[in-house]
Amino acid sequence: HWLGADPNGGIFYGSDYFDKCYEYAEKLILEGKAYVDDLTRDEMREYRGSDAGKPSRPSPWRDRTPEENLDLFRRMRAGEFKEGEKTLRAKIDLASPNMNMRDPAIYRIKYAEHHRQGNKWCIYPMYDFAHPIQDAIEGITHSMCSLEFENHRPLYNWVIENIFGTEFPKQREFARLNMTNTVMSKRYLRELVEMGIVDGWDDPRMPTLCGLRRRGYTASSIFTFVREAGISKSDNLIDMRQLEACIRSELDLTAQRRIAVLDPVKLVVDNYPADKTEYFDIANNPNREANDTTTRKVAFTRELWIENEDFAEVPPPKFK
């Protein structure tokens, strides 16, 4: 809401579509486009070969009939097998140079309570299978991903074409935003939170949106920064000063000025009356483009406080 987002229809959860994912998995099985495999994860990796020239081999269970695969898949859902004992794989292209297309796993057995679905499921769709299905259900036209998912796009398209028979949604990739002297990885930021090094995700030292908000950044300054940084498919490093310049430019036009002395030195004006006080009108924002005509009263007396760095008993040449 702080950034202006107001999701129509509420917040969507991927787990709400588990029933549809299961339905579409059965569709692929009946069409001969998916099969239940008995290979372990390590064996599956060995059979798939590598993109360095090692050829793949078909699983001994790749040619099971649709009827047998459907029966096994339903028994997977019923909890008749152990974790890793059975896996549902898409039947695509074992000779593809793209490893993601060499019969990827699309369902695994996992006996774990889900934070929203409870114990309803003991099989779960893999990300590359659930992602395009969820996008299609929600009417997404373009799914924006970071560059590490670029090689996953052919699989994304395969799922869309073979389940929905449409061109949309489409996946597009862009480079992650990296900033100088700043940790951006969620994994490392989580460590800072869990170790108590920071006070939480909204600690002003954190490069999170809630952290930036507590530090004083406005939503509009963040939008300005994102527009200036732009979208690229090349990895780049943005100078943190660019973000700081965005908020500084905005505050220069909107913030009223106040004065503070951090390292004070007392200054006494000997030739100014001790009992006299003069008040001067000072502009709250001297920037002419700010359109702020308000002023405030500032007192001038015999005793003043100045910054220590602004004082020198023996000033250097050209000291001001």
Regions found by a protein language model. Give the residues of each.
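Short, compositionally biased low-complexity segments
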Residues: 1, 43-51, 129-132, 194, ...
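Short beta-alpha connecting loops at secondary-structure transitions
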Residues: 8-10, 144, 207
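Active-site cores that bind ATP or allylic diphosphates and position pyrophosphate for catalysis
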Residues: 13-14, 20, 24-189, 199, ...
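A glycine-rich helix N-cap at a beta->alpha junction
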Residues: 1-15, 25
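Long, charged, mostly alpha-helical binding arms that flank functional sites
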Residues: 169-246, 250
